[in-house]
């Protein structure tokens, strides 16, 4: 089973008591990717963002590959780099990555895009769009979205006055 390659690499990476060097995990994840286990790109992209292995160009390369094969975690991680890392900032590409997350019902990405529209730092503030996205995340089971919607109603972001009934 090709997916066992990815799992084996993950075990080697997480459990040093197995006696395998962490570098071997990267090699095995790459083999898994080339064998068609697209989710291996998630592990590579994520771990190349970690301090010990920090290599953002490699992280971006793997996350782009993952997103190409519809890995929504890759799209989300890529969006964070493009939106918030000054050295790699590409707001248009970052928003496209988050829109992919919305299309694929990836809650963290939906909430992330809602936050972008709520804050208005990267795009024009749009409370209506933020609300729409949070409602979608709520429908998918996000407790965080429920809290944020309630908070927005409580503080009057979604109505002229605070709406304590809707906040509950």
Language-model features: where?
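Hydrophobic face of amphipathic alpha-helices that form TPR/SEL1-like repeat modules
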Residues: 9-14, 41-50, 75-84, 110-119, ...
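Structural signature of tandem alpha-helical TPR/SEL1-like repeats
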Residues: 17-28, 52-62, 86-97, 124-133, ...
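Short helix-capping/linker turns of helical repeat alpha-solenoids
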Residues: 1-2, 14-16, 35-38, 50-51, ...
């Amino acid at each position: 089973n090709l997916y066992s390659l990815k799992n084996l690499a993950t075990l080697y990476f997480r459990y040093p008591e197995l006696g395998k060097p962490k570098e071997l995990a990267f090699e095995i994840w790459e083999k898994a990717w080339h064998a068609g286990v697209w989710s291996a790109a998630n592990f590579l992209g994520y771990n190349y963002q970690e301090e010990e292995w920090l290599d953002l160009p490699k992280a971006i390369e793997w996350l782009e590959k993952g997103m190409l094969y519809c890995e929504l975690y890759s799209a989300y991680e890529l969006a964070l780099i493009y939106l918030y890392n000054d050295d790699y900032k590409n707001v248009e590409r970052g928003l496209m990555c988050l829109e992919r997350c919305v299309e694929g019902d990836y809650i963290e990405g939906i909430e992330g895009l809602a936050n972008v529209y709520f804050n208005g730092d990267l795009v024009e503030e749009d409370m209506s769009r933020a609300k729409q996205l949070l409602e979608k995340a709520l429908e998918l089971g996000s407790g965080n979205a429920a809290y944020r919607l309630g908070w927005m109603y409580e503080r009057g972001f979604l109505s002229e006055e605070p709406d304590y009934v809707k906040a509950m």
